[in-house]
Swiss-Prot record:
Pfam families: Cyclin_C_2, Cyclin_N. GO terms for cellular component: cytoplasm; nucleus. The modification N-acetylalanine is found at residue 2. This is Cyclin-H1-1. InterPro entries: Cyclin-like_dom (IPR013763), Cyclin-like_sf (IPR036915), Cyclin/Ssn8 (IPR043198), Cyclin_C_2 (IPR031658), Cyclin_N (IPR006671). It comes from Arabidopsis thaliana (Mouse-ear cress).
Length: 336
C-alpha cells in the first residue's frame, strides 16, 4: 500500500465531487452534440484501437433525427451503475479474486470519465475491462473462456481492448481496499493484544468488511477517496454490525501515528461521506433500464425494427434447433 502515495491513481484518478461531476457532464455533452450534429453517437472501434467517428448528417430537416433523444447525465449514471453490478456478477461467476473485480470496476469507471455510454455500449466495455483486469493481475483467462462462460462473442472483447487501454492512459495498476483491510485487521490484533477468541472475531470482521468493500466499490467512492479510507469505512460498517472493537478508540490510535495526515474528527467525517454513498446507492433493475436501453439503442443507430427482426430470427433458429434435438440443455496501512 505504501506505493499508492506515488501512484498514478493518487495523482490522476482521485477527484473532488465537483470535478467528478464535471467530467461526467462533459462526457455527456460531447455525446449530445455528436447526436445533434451526426444523428448518431456510435464511435466505431477496430482491433488496433483506431476510432471512427460518425460523419456529419446531410440535411438537418430529417424528422427521424428530431425524434432522437439523448440520455441525460442521470440516465447515464443509471446505465453505468447497472453494468458495474454486472462486472461483479461476471467476476463472481468465474470465482475471480476480489482484486480482479476491483481492478475491472476501476477500469470501467475510468473509461466512462472519457466517454459517454452513448458512444460505446457499456456491455461491451464491461467485458473488456474484466479481461484486461485478469491480464494485469496475472490471472490467465483467455477472452475465449470469458466469452464462452457468459455466452458472448470473445472477438468483441478483443476488439475493444486497445481502445480501453488508451482511454485509461495505460495507467493499469489499481490499488483496491482489500489488502488495506487485511493490514488494518492485523494491526487490530496488536491493538487489542488479541486472544484466541478475539482473533476469531477479527476473522469475522475481515470477512464482513470484505463484503462491505464490494458494496463500496459500486459507488463513486473509489474515484473520490484513497483505498485506505475505503478500507476503514468498510471495517467501520462491518464493525457496526459485529461489535468487535471500539472503533472510535481505534481511529484515535491511527491518527496518533507519526505519519497521520488527519485528526480524528477529519477522518471520521471522511468515513461518514463514504458510508453515505453506500447507504444511498441503488442498483437499477432490468425494469428500470428498459426505457434507457431504448433511448441508447436509438442514439447508437440500432433501430427497434432491426432488433425485432434479429429476435424473430433467433427465436426461429432456436425453435428449429429444439425440434431437431429432443433433449433441452503489522503497522496500520496508510489512509491518505
Amino acid at each position: 500500500m505504501a506505493d499508492f502515495q506515488t501512484s498514478t491513481q493518487r495523482a490522476k484518478w482521485i477527484f473532488t465531487p465537483q470535478k467528478l461531476a464535471e467530467r461526467y457532464k462533459a462526457a455527456n455533452q460531447r455525446a449530445v452534440q455528436m447526436l445533434e450534429k451526426c444523428g448518431t453517437t456510435q464511435v466505431e472501434v477496430d482491433a488496433s484501437g483506431s476510432l471512427t467517428y460518425p460523419k456529419d448528417k446531410v440535411g438537418s430537416g430529417d424528422q427521424a433525427d428530431k425524434k432522437l433523444k439523448p440520455l441525460s447525465a442521470d440516465e447515464e449514471r443509471f446505465m453505468r451503475a447497472f453494468y458495474e453490478a454486472k462486472v461483479q456478477e461476471v467476476c463472481s461467476a468465474f470465482a475471480f479474486p476480489h482484486k480482479i473485480q476491483a481492478t475491472a470496476l476501476q477500469y470501467f469507471k475510468r473509461f466512462y470519465l472519457q466517454w459517454s455510454v452513448m458512444q460505446h455500449h457499456p456491455k461491451e466495455i464491461m467485458l473488456t475491462c474484466v479481461y484486461a483486469a485478469c491480464k494485469i493481475e496475472e490471472n490467465h483467462v483467455s477472452a475465449e473462456e470469458i466469452g464462452k462462460g457468459i455466452n458472448q462473442d470473445h472477438r468483441i472483447i478483443l476488439k475493444y481492448e486497445m481502445a480501453v487501454l488508451q482511454s485509461l492512459e495505460f495507467d493499469l495498476i489499481v490499488y483496491a481496499p482489500y489488502r488495506a483491510i487485511e493490514g488494518f485487521v492485523n494491526n487490530m490484533e496488536e491493538f487489542l493484544q488479541a486472544r484466541d477468541d478475539e482473533i476469531q472475531k477479527l476473522e469475522s470482521l475481515l470477512k464482513g468488511a470484505t463484503a462491505e468493500a464490494d458494496k463500496v466499490m459500486l459507488t463513486d467512492a473509489p474515484l473520490l477517496f484513497p483505498p485506505g479510507q475505503l478500507a476503514l469505512a468498510s471495517l467501520r460498517i462491518a464493525n457496526g454490525v459485529l461489535g468487535v472493537i471500539d472503533f472510535d478508540r481505534y481511529l484515535e490510535n491511527i491518527v496518533s501515528q507519526p505519519n497521520s495526515e488527519h485528526t480524528t474528527s477529519e477522518l471520521t467525517k471522511l468515513l461518514d461521506n463514504i458510508e453515505y454513498l453506500v447507504k444511498n446507492y441503488k442498483c437499477p433493475s432490468e425494469k428500470d433500464m428498459k426505457h434507457i436501453n431504448r433511448k441508447l439503442k436509438s442514439c447508437l443507430g440500432h433501430s427497434s425494427s432491426h432488433d425485432e427482426s434479429k429476435k424473430r430470427e433467433k427465436r426461429s433458429k432456436h425453435k428449429s434447433h429444439r425440434s431437431s434435438n429432443d433433449t433441452p440443455n503489522g503497522a496500520p496501512p496508510p489512509i491518505g
